[in-house]
């Protein structure tokens, strides 16, 4: 689960780079939303991984 969260976070970051760079001006809001969603998912997955190890 952590793997998928990190993959989607990277995809959101790439979309943000394109959006903030002016390449896809319409994708800026989507990239912002995806970034925060997947950043939260990555943190939750990391914490869940730590809990399951113990």
Curated annotation (Swiss-Prot):
One Gene Ontology term, aspect cellular component: plasma membrane
Pfam families, sorted: DUF1328
InterPro entries listed in its UniProt record: DUF1328 (IPR009760)
Compartmental location: Cell membrane
UniProt keywords, alphabetically: Cell membrane, Membrane, Transmembrane, Transmembrane helix
HAMAP family: UPF0391
Family to which the UniProt record says this protein belongs: Belongs to the UPF0391 family.
Protein name (record): UPF0391 membrane protein Bpro_0879
Originating species: Polaromonas sp. (strain JS666 / ATCC BAA-500)
């Amino acid at each position: 689960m952590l793997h998928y969260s990190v993959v989607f976070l990277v995809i959101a970051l790439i979309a943000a780079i394109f959006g903030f760079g002016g390449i896809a001006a319409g994708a800026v809001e989507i990239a912002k939303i995806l970034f925060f969603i997947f950043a939260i998912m990555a943190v939750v997955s990391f914490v869940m991984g730590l809990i399951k190890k113990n």
